[in-house]
From Swiss-Prot:
GO molecular function, one term: iron ion binding
Role: Involved in iron-sulfur cluster biogenesis. Binds a 4Fe-4S cluster, can transfer this cluster to apoproteins, and thereby intervenes in the maturation of Fe/S proteins. Could also act as a scaffold/chaperone for damaged Fe/S proteins.
Cofactors demanded by this protein: [4Fe-4S] cluster
Name of the protein in its database record: Fe/S biogenesis protein NfuA
Ranges annotated as spanning the membrane: none
Record-stated family: Belongs to the NfuA family.
Amino acid sequence: MITITDAAQSHFAKLLANQEEGTQIRVFVINPGTPTAECGVSYCPPDAVEATDTELKFEQLSAYIDELSKPYLEDAEIDFVTDQLGSQLTLKAPNAKMRKVDDNAPLMERVEYVLQSQINPQLAGHGGRVTLMEITPDALAILQFGGGCNGCSMVDVTLKEGIEKELLQKFPELKGVRDLTEHQRGEHSYY
């Protein structure tokens, strides 16, 4: 469910050593399943453990997850990374904004999940997003770009070299990707 690397476990163990006896960590999602979902980690003293919590036991600590957050933390990873600029704790939760879709779900749902959980977070750095409009009977994914992607001079490269390659690799049943957007270059466009 959640991976906590050895480096992150060591970091947490040092922090927990200064807390009340028996204190562990809690991993949670605020506003799960929404575009504003945010993940967090906090201390979890023994008296804060709920009967409905799930306990994940690791070598150096336990992590508690509340019932509501659990499906949104599927495949999450917590790491403690050190580089030339210092150290930081990272929490990656690809399913926080929407639940992971079953491998047997309809193609439209699986493609939409990849767009929302993997593609749109990358496009968001430029203020952009992409929406799946339909999958045609001849297996073409019809997309519409918005935000900073609308009118961007690099949208064709993003579509063919980024999105299409990734979708065709993940979904061999797709034959291609097409852009439905009527691009209007303007102040909103990322150049």
